[in-house]
Structure formats: C-alpha cells, structure tokens
Swiss-Prot record:
Homodimer. GO terms for biological process: histidyl-tRNA aminoacylation. It is found in: Mitochondrion. The keyword ATP-binding applies. Residues 1-31 form a transit peptide. It comes from Mus musculus (Mouse). Its main location: mitochondrion. GO terms for molecular function: ATP binding; histidine-tRNA ligase activity; identical protein binding. This is Histidine--tRNA ligase, mitochondrial. Pfam families: HGTP_anticodon, tRNA-synt_His.
C-alpha cells in the first residue's frame, strides 16, 4: 500500500475491514443450525446402521401354510363341507370384523380375548371371536326365521397359543347351524349325527361326544347353593375341566371367584357322573336335582335326545357328562363336545393330545339380543376345530412317510427339439379346452432331461412328447411317467386317449 494514494489506501483498508469482520449473530446462528442438522442426521444414520437385522417372522399364534399343507387342509375342508351339504346346508359368509358393541355382551368372561381394531372411521370394531354370533346377527338383521347354514372362516382369539398342539390365535372354524322353531331335539340329534359322520370320515381314531344341558348345569349350581350372581363365572371355571383337574378348578372357584368351599364340594359330587340313558333316568330320581324344575326340563330333553341318537345309530358314541359346561354365555340347552379317546403316534407309544376337536350346542336367545323387537329364533349348531384336526392328520402323515402332491397336473407337454414352442402351445391349449389339467416349461428350447425330471418330481402321471418326426407323420408320443413306457398315437386322438387313461387310473 505504500505506493497507493490516500483515497485508494482508504478504499483498500475498508475492503480489508469488510473481509476480516467477524460473522454476524444471524449468520452464526444459521451456520450453527445447519451444522446441528448435519450432526443429527449423521448420528441418526449411525444409529440406524448399528441396529440389529430385522427378524422376519409371522405374528405370535399365527402361521403360514406351505403348498403341501394346503393340500392336506383342503382335503379336510372338502370332507367337512360335503357332509354339511349332504344335510341340506346353504353356504354363508360374514365380515371378519363386527361392531364391538355387538360382541362384548355375548362373551362375558371371554371379552378380554377379543382383538379390537383401532378406531379410524367413527366405528369401534373387533375381529370376530367365533362364527356363531355373526350368524345370529345376520338372522336378526335380515328378519330370517328359518335357515340351515354352514360357514368356513377364520376367527381370532388373544389366547396363549399352544402351537405344538394345534392351538393358535388365528384359526379356521367350520360351523353348521339350524335356525328355526322345530319339535324338540330333532335338529339337535342331527347335529350330533353330522359330528359323528365328519369325525368317522376323517379317520382320526376312536372318539367320544360328551353331552350335557345348560339347564341341568344351572340346576346343579342352584341346588348346590351357587349364588345367582356367580352362575356365569362359576360355569366358566367348570368349562376348564377338560384342561385342569377338579382340584385346580375347585381352587379357582373358591380362591379366585369367592365361592364357598362347601358349595364347591357339592358341585364336585356331580361332575364325576357320566353315562348314557340310564344315567339320565337315575338323575330324574336324584332328591337334590328333583328340586329344580330347570334341571328336570333339561333331563327330559336329554332323554328324548338319546332316543333319537339310538335311531340314528350313534348312541354308542355319545355320553352324558355332567362336568361339561361350555363357557360361552349364549348356550341355553343341550351342549356337546367331541374328544378323541386316544390317538397313538405309534402302537403302544406316544399319544397325540389336542383336546376337543368339535363342539356346539343350543342357543335359543342369541338372535333376540340383536332383534330390536326381541323376536326369538331358536338355534342349534356345531363347530369343527379344523386346526386341531389338521395337526393330527399332519402328524399321522409324517409318521407314515406319506407324500403329498402339491399340484393336480395330469399331463405335461414336452419336446426334445428346439423351436417347437408353437406346437407345444397349440397342444396345451387343446388340453385345457378339454378340461385336462396340463402344464409345460416356460422356455423356448427346454432340455428333454429337464422336462423329464420335472415330471417325476411333481408326480405328473402323463407326458405328451412332440418332435419334428412326430409332426411330419401326424402322430404324437404319450409317455407314462411312472413306468416310463411310451406309445405312439394319432395326433387327432390325443385328447380321447388321455381322457381314457385318466378315467382308468
């Protein structure tokens, strides 16, 4: 600057002053803010990178079903549904969730097991707990007085799952119900007949259907001295006798639900009884039960029921069991539950235990709870425990080494040569048009060995082979995959020959 004039020196000094001035407060704050954001983003990124790998799994109490499992499950469902249809039932489906207020009063002690949905549209909703309450709502909403229906669908219960025994939080139920005013015990007897047909058809082993009547249960409670305010909760405890010993149930009644010990002991005298029509007749003479008109009404219906069961040819599969209570509050009359007597994994060895595999009963007042005018539609029905049955069937198949085909393909269209995609497409379209289940590899030029291996692995019974020689001669080869035998037939008779072989197999 010594060579600059005074003015130029002052200008230069001012310029240097501007350049060397400390940053303003606003600038400092802005810079600090940007730095803070950058640091925070960096920390978040670091934290994200340090998180453990996400575990991919299904929610607790649920599961996926593989293609092999789906084949077994569908066969079980087909047998159950065909039985329902054989008895004249119509199919029905209802929403997977219902208005919460419609469900809460119907389950009482089981209310805490329901899955509630988050309120997003002004309606409080819950996933359905069973298929019975939605059916009753459907009858009331549509003012139906008579209906014989079946329904297959998933239900949800927030229980502790026991997956090793076929018990889940999400599971499938198959229900059959008869709604309407009919002469006593005829529909009830048919429901028990259906239960026997299904369990016999599935070949699960020996089974027993335990029956009782809620009026008999309430009568027992009354003559034993159970306060009316505790009837429902004590009945809920008694329903656990299939999972707990009488000592455990008694402890729950006394210690947790406040029942007097002497009252619990009097109940214990009754729950040991089980038998057939002779037990019903003996109970009529019981000096304690004879004091209850409600119990006598139930015993009268049970006596009539056993007569119909004898005519249906299933009386030997049914046993009156006074320990059976069925905890759901909507039951009003006959109740029943099917159990497998013993399903040995191997002769004389391990036993597969899954509890009850079917249950049901009469619920005459449920529809009236939905109907604005309180109109009664008596109902009786049953529910098949598909998951537990599936568990048993699956275990038996594992023990026997039985294999399952995951497809129903009957014919595979193949070629040993290149550039024969068009011919294969024409043939497979012809087979599909004839209703034949067929497939092919999605490649222009597949290797013949690859096609043969695919057929053998998938257990496809027949293979159609087309090549240049066959096309020129107007013929086609038909190969039996199992025996590896091949025959040459006229191209025009392909469909007829395949249909003939399939009908003979």
């Amino acid at each position: 600057m010594p060579h600059l004039g005074p003015l130029r020196r002052r200008a230069w000094a001012a310029l240097l002053g501007q350049l060397l001035r400390p940053p303003s407060t606003v600038c400092t704050r802005g810079c600090h803010s940007q730095v803070a954001k950058a640091v925070l983003t960096s920390e978040q990124l670091k934290s994200h990178q340090e998180k453990p790998n996400f575990v991919i799994k299904v929610p607790k109490g649920t599961r996926d079903l593989s293609p092999q499992q789906m084949v077994v499950r569908e066969k079980i469902l087909d047998k159950i549904i065909s039985c329902f249809k054989r008895h004249g039932a119509k199919g029905l489906d209802t929403p997977a969730f219902e208005l919460k207020e419609m469900l809460t009063e119907k389950y009482e002690d089981n209310f805490g097991l329901m899955y509630d949905l988050k309120d997003q549209g002004g309606e409080l909703l819950s996933l359905r707990y069973d298929l019975t309450v939605p059916f009753a709502r459907y009858l009331a909403m549509n003012k139906l007085k008579k209906m014989k229906r079946y329904q297959v669908g998933k239900v949800w219960r927030r229980e502790s799952p026991a997956i090793a025994q076929g018990r889940y939080r999400e599971f499938c139920q198959c229900d059959f119900d008869i709604a309407g005013e009919f002469d006593p015990m005829i529909p009830d007897a048919e429901c028990l007949r259906i239960m026997c047909e299904i369990l016999s058809g599935l070949q699960l082993g020996d089974f027993l259907i335990k029956v009782n009547d809620r009026r008999v249960v309430d009568g027992i409670f009354a003559v034993c001295g159970v306060p009316e305010s505790k009837l429902r909760t004590i009945c809920s405890s008694m329903d656990k006798l299939d999972k707990m010993s009488w000592e455990g149930v008694r402890h729950e009644m006394v210690a947790k639900k406040g029942l007097a010990p002497e009252v619990a002991d009097r109940i214990g005298d009754f729950v040991q009884y089980h038998g057939g029509i002779s037990l019903v007749e003996d109970l009529f003479k019981d000096p304690r039960l004879s004091q209850s008109q409600l119990a006598l009404q139930g015993l009268g219906d049970l006596k009539l029921l056993f007569e119909y069961l004898r005519l249906f040819g299933i009386a030997d599969k049914i046993s009156l069991d006074l320990s059976l209570a069925r905890g759901l509050d909507y039951y009003t009359g006959v109740i029943y539950e099917a159990v497998l007597l013993e399903s040995p994994a191997q002769a004389g060895k391990e036993t597969l235990s899954v509890g009850s595999v079917a249950a049901g009963g009469r619920y005459d007042n449920l529809v009236a709870q939905f109907d604005p005018k309180g109109h009664h539609v008596p109902c009786v029905g049953l529910s098949i425990g598909v998951e537990r049955i599936f568990y048993l069937v699956e275990q038996k198949m594992k023990m026997s080494g039985e294999k399952v085909r995951t497809t129903e393909t009957q014919v595979f269209v193949a070629t040993p040569q290149k550039n024969f995609l068009q011919e294969r497409l024409k043939i497979i379209a012809e087979l599909w048009d004839a209703g034949i289940k067929a497939e092919m590899l999605y490649k222009n030029n597949p290797k013949l060995l690859t096609q043969l291996h695919y057929c053998e692995k998938a257990d496809i019974p027949l293979m159609v082979i087309i090549g240049e020689q066959e096309r020129n001669e107007g013929v086609i080869k038909l190969r039996s995959v199992a025996s590896r035998e091949e025959v040459t037939i006229n191209r025009e008779s392909l469909v007829a020959e395949i249909q003939k072989r399939l009908s003979e197999s």
